Protein backbone atom coordinates (compact mmCIF):
# COMPACT_ATOMS: atom_id res chain seq x y z
CA UNK A 1 0.00 0.00 0.00
CA UNK A 2 1.52 3.32 -0.96
CA UNK A 3 0.26 6.90 -0.83
CA UNK A 4 -0.80 8.69 -4.01
CA UNK A 5 0.48 12.16 -4.82
CA UNK A 6 -2.86 13.67 -3.84
CA UNK A 7 -2.85 11.86 -0.51
CA UNK A 8 0.68 13.05 0.23
CA UNK A 9 -0.32 16.65 -0.54
CA UNK A 10 -3.30 16.41 1.81
CA UNK A 11 -1.17 15.04 4.66
CA UNK A 12 1.66 17.52 4.23
CA UNK A 13 -0.60 20.57 4.00
CA UNK A 14 -2.70 19.50 6.97
CA UNK A 15 0.43 18.73 8.97
CA UNK A 16 1.55 22.34 8.59
CA UNK A 17 -1.71 23.40 10.28
CA UNK A 18 -1.61 20.66 12.91
CA UNK A 19 1.98 21.09 13.98
CA UNK A 20 1.19 24.28 15.90
CA UNK A 21 -1.02 22.21 18.26
CA UNK A 22 1.14 19.08 18.14
CA UNK A 23 1.69 18.72 21.87
CA UNK A 24 -1.94 19.05 22.95
CA UNK A 25 -3.03 16.81 20.08
CA UNK A 26 -0.67 14.13 21.35
CA UNK A 27 -1.93 14.38 24.90
CA UNK A 28 -5.57 14.33 23.84
CA UNK A 29 -4.96 11.31 21.59
CA UNK A 30 -3.49 9.34 24.45
CA UNK A 31 -6.30 10.37 26.83
CA UNK A 32 -8.81 9.13 24.28
CA UNK A 33 -6.87 5.89 23.84
CA UNK A 34 -6.70 5.08 27.54
CA UNK A 35 -10.36 5.91 28.17
CA UNK A 36 -11.86 4.09 25.18
CA UNK A 37 -9.41 1.18 25.23
CA UNK A 38 -8.33 0.69 28.85
CA UNK A 39 -6.34 -2.43 27.94
CA UNK A 40 -3.78 -0.14 26.27
CA UNK A 41 -2.79 1.12 29.71
CA UNK A 42 -1.05 -2.21 30.29
CA UNK A 43 1.89 -0.84 28.33
CA UNK A 44 2.33 2.01 30.81
CA UNK A 45 2.42 0.57 34.34
CA UNK A 46 5.28 2.93 35.10
CA UNK A 47 3.35 6.07 34.09
CA UNK A 48 1.06 8.47 35.90
CA UNK A 49 -1.84 8.40 33.45
CA UNK A 50 -4.08 11.01 35.08
CA UNK A 51 -5.23 13.66 32.59
CA UNK A 52 -2.72 16.51 32.68
CA UNK A 53 0.13 14.40 33.98
CA UNK A 54 3.59 15.53 32.87
CA UNK A 55 4.42 12.03 31.64
CA UNK A 56 1.26 11.92 29.51
CA UNK A 57 2.09 15.28 27.98
CA UNK A 58 5.69 14.31 27.27
CA UNK A 59 4.73 11.01 25.74
CA UNK A 60 1.94 12.54 23.67
CA UNK A 61 4.43 15.04 22.25
CA UNK A 62 6.80 12.24 21.36
CA UNK A 63 4.14 10.28 19.53
CA UNK A 64 2.87 13.22 17.48
CA UNK A 65 6.45 14.34 16.73
CA UNK A 66 7.08 10.92 15.21
CA UNK A 67 3.93 11.24 13.09
CA UNK A 68 5.30 14.61 12.02
CA UNK A 69 8.64 13.05 11.07
CA UNK A 70 6.76 10.60 8.89
CA UNK A 71 4.79 13.46 7.28
CA UNK A 72 7.98 15.46 6.64
CA UNK A 73 9.59 12.43 4.97
CA UNK A 74 6.42 11.17 3.39
CA UNK A 75 8.27 9.85 0.35
CA UNK A 76 10.34 7.54 2.52
CA UNK A 77 8.59 6.81 5.79
CA UNK A 78 10.54 3.57 6.22
CA UNK A 79 13.84 5.39 6.40
CA UNK A 80 12.50 8.19 8.62
CA UNK A 81 11.09 5.77 11.21
CA UNK A 82 13.71 3.04 10.97
CA UNK A 83 15.02 3.51 14.53
CA UNK A 84 11.49 3.67 15.93
CA UNK A 85 10.65 0.53 14.02
CA UNK A 86 13.51 -1.30 15.74
CA UNK A 87 12.50 0.10 19.11
CA UNK A 88 8.97 -1.25 18.73
CA UNK A 89 10.14 -4.64 17.43
CA UNK A 90 12.85 -5.43 19.96
CA UNK A 91 12.14 -3.36 23.06
CA UNK A 92 8.54 -2.17 23.25
CA UNK A 93 6.87 -5.07 21.44
CA UNK A 94 3.44 -3.43 21.47
CA UNK A 95 0.93 -5.87 19.98
CA UNK A 96 0.14 -4.75 16.41
CA UNK A 97 -3.59 -4.50 17.11
CA UNK A 98 -2.92 -1.40 19.22
CA UNK A 99 -1.61 0.66 16.32
CA UNK A 100 -5.12 0.67 14.86
CA UNK A 101 -6.55 1.85 18.18
CA UNK A 102 -4.04 4.69 18.51
CA UNK A 103 -4.51 5.69 14.86
CA UNK A 104 -8.28 5.83 15.36
CA UNK A 105 -7.92 8.05 18.43
CA UNK A 106 -5.59 10.39 16.54
CA UNK A 107 -8.14 10.63 13.72
CA UNK A 108 -10.89 11.44 16.25
CA UNK A 109 -8.70 14.16 17.76
CA UNK A 110 -7.99 15.67 14.34
CA UNK A 111 -11.68 15.45 13.37
CA UNK A 112 -12.74 17.23 16.56
CA UNK A 113 -10.14 20.01 16.19
CA UNK A 114 -10.21 20.53 12.42
CA UNK A 115 -13.73 19.57 11.32
CA UNK A 116 -13.68 21.75 8.19
CA UNK A 117 -10.39 20.26 7.01
CA UNK A 118 -11.29 16.69 7.90
CA UNK A 119 -13.31 15.99 4.77
CA UNK A 120 -14.03 12.44 3.61
CA UNK A 121 -11.01 12.69 1.32
CA UNK A 122 -8.74 13.93 4.10
CA UNK A 123 -10.10 11.23 6.41
CA UNK A 124 -9.22 8.59 3.82
CA UNK A 125 -5.73 10.01 3.31
CA UNK A 126 -4.99 10.16 7.05
CA UNK A 127 -6.36 6.68 7.69
CA UNK A 128 -4.12 5.34 4.94
CA UNK A 129 -1.08 7.37 6.09
CA UNK A 130 -1.37 6.14 9.67
CA UNK A 131 -1.82 2.63 8.35
CA UNK A 132 1.48 2.98 6.46
CA UNK A 133 3.17 4.36 9.59
CA UNK A 134 1.82 1.41 11.61
CA UNK A 135 3.13 -1.05 9.01
CA UNK A 136 6.57 0.52 9.16
CA UNK A 137 6.59 0.31 12.96
CA UNK A 138 5.65 -3.39 12.94
CA UNK A 139 7.64 -4.54 9.90
CA UNK A 140 10.57 -5.88 11.94
CA UNK A 141 8.41 -7.78 14.45
CA UNK A 142 9.23 -11.16 12.93
CA UNK B 1 -24.50 -8.48 28.58
CA UNK B 2 -23.20 -4.93 28.18
CA UNK B 3 -24.09 -2.52 30.94
CA UNK B 4 -24.13 1.23 30.36
CA UNK B 5 -23.76 3.57 33.32
CA UNK B 6 -26.11 6.51 33.73
CA UNK B 7 -23.33 8.87 32.62
CA UNK B 8 -22.66 6.82 29.51
CA UNK B 9 -26.35 6.84 28.61
CA UNK B 10 -26.49 10.62 28.98
CA UNK B 11 -23.34 11.06 26.88
CA UNK B 12 -24.97 8.99 24.16
CA UNK B 13 -28.57 10.22 24.19
CA UNK B 14 -27.73 13.91 24.54
CA UNK B 15 -25.58 13.88 21.40
CA UNK B 16 -28.04 11.70 19.51
CA UNK B 17 -30.88 14.13 20.19
CA UNK B 18 -28.89 16.92 18.49
CA UNK B 19 -28.11 14.90 15.39
CA UNK B 20 -29.74 15.12 11.99
CA UNK B 21 -30.03 11.38 11.53
CA UNK B 22 -30.82 11.59 7.83
CA UNK B 23 -27.76 13.69 7.00
CA UNK B 24 -25.44 11.88 9.36
CA UNK B 25 -26.51 8.53 7.95
CA UNK B 26 -25.58 9.52 4.42
CA UNK B 27 -22.31 10.94 5.66
CA UNK B 28 -21.44 7.84 7.66
CA UNK B 29 -22.14 5.39 4.86
CA UNK B 30 -20.48 7.70 2.35
CA UNK B 31 -17.30 7.99 4.40
CA UNK B 32 -17.22 4.22 4.88
CA UNK B 33 -17.27 3.76 1.11
CA UNK B 34 -14.63 6.47 0.59
CA UNK B 35 -12.20 5.56 3.36
CA UNK B 36 -12.55 1.76 2.95
CA UNK B 37 -13.32 1.38 -0.76
CA UNK B 38 -13.53 -2.41 -0.54
CA UNK B 39 -16.80 -1.95 1.33
CA UNK B 40 -18.29 -0.90 -2.00
CA UNK B 41 -18.52 -4.62 -2.77
CA UNK B 42 -21.96 -4.67 -1.16
CA UNK B 43 -23.33 -1.88 -3.30
CA UNK B 44 -22.79 -2.80 -6.96
CA UNK B 45 -26.26 -1.56 -7.83
CA UNK B 46 -25.82 1.88 -6.28
CA UNK B 47 -24.63 3.56 -9.48
CA UNK B 48 -21.82 6.12 -9.48
CA UNK B 49 -19.30 5.50 -6.70
CA UNK B 50 -16.31 6.67 -8.73
CA UNK B 51 -15.09 9.52 -6.51
CA UNK B 52 -15.58 10.91 -3.01
CA UNK B 53 -17.95 13.61 -4.29
CA UNK B 54 -19.88 11.08 -6.40
CA UNK B 55 -20.23 8.82 -3.37
CA UNK B 56 -21.27 11.53 -0.93
CA UNK B 57 -23.76 12.97 -3.44
CA UNK B 58 -25.19 9.61 -4.46
CA UNK B 59 -28.91 9.50 -3.58
CA UNK B 60 -28.87 5.73 -2.98
CA UNK B 61 -26.00 6.13 -0.54
CA UNK B 62 -27.90 8.85 1.30
CA UNK B 63 -31.10 6.82 1.42
CA UNK B 64 -29.38 3.69 2.63
CA UNK B 65 -27.31 5.63 5.12
CA UNK B 66 -30.49 7.07 6.57
CA UNK B 67 -31.94 3.55 6.91
CA UNK B 68 -28.85 2.29 8.70
CA UNK B 69 -28.64 5.18 11.11
CA UNK B 70 -32.35 5.12 11.87
CA UNK B 71 -31.86 1.53 12.89
CA UNK B 72 -29.00 2.64 15.08
CA UNK B 73 -31.53 4.85 16.83
CA UNK B 74 -33.27 1.65 17.94
CA UNK B 75 -30.03 0.62 19.59
CA UNK B 76 -30.03 3.81 21.60
CA UNK B 77 -33.59 3.20 22.77
CA UNK B 78 -32.67 -0.36 23.80
CA UNK B 79 -29.13 -0.07 25.13
CA UNK B 80 -29.74 -2.70 27.80
CA UNK B 81 -31.12 -5.21 25.34
CA UNK B 82 -29.08 -5.00 22.16
CA UNK B 83 -28.77 -8.68 21.31
CA UNK B 84 -32.54 -9.18 21.28
CA UNK B 85 -33.17 -5.87 19.51
CA UNK B 86 -30.85 -6.81 16.65
CA UNK B 87 -31.53 -10.56 16.45
CA UNK B 88 -33.54 -10.36 13.23
CA UNK B 89 -31.15 -7.86 11.62
CA UNK B 90 -28.25 -10.11 12.58
CA UNK B 91 -29.82 -13.05 10.78
CA UNK B 92 -30.51 -10.86 7.76
CA UNK B 93 -26.90 -9.63 7.55
CA UNK B 94 -25.64 -13.20 7.76
CA UNK B 95 -28.10 -15.19 5.68
CA UNK B 96 -29.22 -12.71 3.04
CA UNK B 97 -26.66 -9.89 2.91
CA UNK B 98 -23.52 -11.96 3.66
CA UNK B 99 -21.78 -9.05 5.36
CA UNK B 100 -18.52 -9.72 7.22
CA UNK B 101 -19.08 -8.40 10.78
CA UNK B 102 -15.76 -6.57 10.53
CA UNK B 103 -17.71 -4.04 8.47
CA UNK B 104 -19.88 -3.22 11.51
CA UNK B 105 -16.73 -2.26 13.41
CA UNK B 106 -15.52 -0.11 10.52
CA UNK B 107 -18.86 1.70 10.27
CA UNK B 108 -19.00 2.20 14.03
CA UNK B 109 -15.61 3.91 13.99
CA UNK B 110 -16.60 6.08 11.03
CA UNK B 111 -19.67 7.17 13.02
CA UNK B 112 -17.47 8.12 15.97
CA UNK B 113 -15.33 10.27 13.70
CA UNK B 114 -18.40 11.98 12.26
CA UNK B 115 -19.59 12.75 15.77
CA UNK B 116 -16.18 14.31 16.42
CA UNK B 117 -16.45 16.57 13.37
CA UNK B 118 -19.97 17.65 14.37
CA UNK B 119 -19.45 18.18 18.07
CA UNK B 120 -15.77 19.18 18.32
CA UNK B 121 -14.77 19.98 21.89
CA UNK B 122 -18.06 18.58 23.19
CA UNK B 123 -16.90 15.18 21.97
CA UNK B 124 -14.59 14.75 24.93
CA UNK B 125 -12.54 11.61 25.58
CA UNK B 126 -15.21 10.53 28.11
CA UNK B 127 -18.04 10.99 25.62
CA UNK B 128 -16.04 9.15 22.98
CA UNK B 129 -15.48 6.23 25.34
CA UNK B 130 -19.24 5.88 25.87
CA UNK B 131 -19.85 5.90 22.14
CA UNK B 132 -17.05 3.40 21.46
CA UNK B 133 -18.73 1.10 23.97
CA UNK B 134 -22.05 1.50 22.16
CA UNK B 135 -20.79 1.00 18.61
CA UNK B 136 -18.80 -2.01 19.76
CA UNK B 137 -21.85 -3.51 21.49
CA UNK B 138 -24.02 -2.90 18.41
CA UNK B 139 -21.40 -4.57 16.19
CA UNK B 140 -21.33 -7.58 18.51
CA UNK B 141 -25.16 -7.75 18.61
CA UNK B 142 -25.32 -7.64 14.81
CA UNK B 143 -22.83 -10.48 14.61
CA UNK B 144 -24.44 -12.52 17.32
CA UNK B 145 -26.70 -14.70 15.13
CA UNK B 146 -24.02 -15.53 12.56
CA UNK B 147 -23.50 -19.18 11.89
Swiss-Prot record, chain B:
Keyword line: Heme, Iron, Metal-binding, Oxygen transport, Phosphoprotein, Transport
A family per Pfam: Globin
Positions with a binding annotation for heme b: 64, 93
Coiled-coil residue spans: none
One record GO biological process: hydrogen peroxide catabolic process
Gene3D superfamilies membership: Globins (1.10.490.10)
Residues the record lists as Phosphoserine modifications: 14, 51
Tissue specificity comment: Red blood cells.
PROSITE patterns: GLOBIN
GO cellular component, one term: blood microparticle
Start and end residues of each Globin domain: 3-147
Top-level taxon: Eukaryota
Subunit and partners: Heterotetramer of two alpha chains and two epsilon chains in early embryonic hemoglobin Gower-2; two zeta chains and two epsilon chains in early embryonic hemoglobin Gower-1.
Assigned protein family: Belongs to the globin family.
The protein's role, per its UniProt record: The epsilon chain is a beta-type chain of early mammalian embryonic hemoglobin.
Protein name: Hemoglobin subunit epsilon
Source organism per UniProt: Cebus olivaceus
Gene: HBE1
Amino acid sequence: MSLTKTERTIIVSMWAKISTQADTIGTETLERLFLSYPQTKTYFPHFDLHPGSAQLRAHGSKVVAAVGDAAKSIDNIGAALSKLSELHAYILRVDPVNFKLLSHCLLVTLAARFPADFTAEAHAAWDKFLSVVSSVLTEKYR
Amino acid sequence: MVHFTAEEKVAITSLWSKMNVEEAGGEALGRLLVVYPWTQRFFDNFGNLSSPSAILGNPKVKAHGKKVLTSFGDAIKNMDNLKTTFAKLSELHCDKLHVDPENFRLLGNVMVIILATHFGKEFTPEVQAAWQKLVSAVAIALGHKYH
